[in-house]
UniProtKB/Swiss-Prot annotation:
Family affiliation: Belongs to the bacterial ribosomal protein bL21 family.
Domain of life according to the entry: Bacteria
This protein's UniProt keywords: Ribonucleoprotein, Ribosomal protein, RNA-binding, rRNA-binding
Subunit structure and binding partners: Part of the 50S ribosomal subunit. Contacts protein L20.
Natural source organism: Lawsonia intracellularis (strain PHE/MN1-00)
Protein name stated in the entry: Large ribosomal subunit protein bL21
One MF term in the entry's GO annotations: structural constituent of ribosome
UniProt cross-references to Pfam families, sorted A to Z: Ribosomal_L21p
GO cellular component, one term: cytoplasm
Function per UniProt: This protein binds to 23S rRNA in the presence of protein L20.
InterPro entries in alphabetical order: bL21-like, bL21-like_sf, Ribosomal_bL21
GO biological process, one term: translation
Length: 102
């Protein structure tokens, strides 16, 4: 069974035991998080929400917090000999899906 959930403004397709990386969530390592914004649950009898499925939730456990690789943003203006280089590192939370409930 799989589910499509919304976490951090993005959609993820998850199964039991899968590991996902979402935008940083304020939760301690080892705690369980419940997602109730579920768009679809697939399997033998798929269900599609309008926009969400009522009384369904996905349970995930926080594995770690970290930071992604640095992304460089480079801007250049022609003929001015002007340029700007900026770096960005996004914080993330690693989650392991432990269950999908209807």
């Amino acid at each position: 069974m799989y589910a499509i959930i919304e976490a951090g403004g993005k959609q993820f397709c998850v199964e039991e035991g899968s590991k996902i990386f979402v935008s940083k969530i304020d939760a301690e390592v080892g705690t369980e998080i419940f997602f109730d914004k579920i768009f679809m649950i697939g399997g033998s009898s798929p269900q599609i929400g309008t926009p969400y499925i009522n009384n369904a939730k996905v349970i995930a456990k926080v594995l770690e917090h970290g930071r992604d690789k640095k992304i460089l943003v480079f801007k250049k203006w022609r003929r001015n000999d002007s340029r700007k280089l900026q770096g960005h590192r996004q914080d993330y939370t690693a989650l392991k899906v432990t269950g999908i409930q209807l």
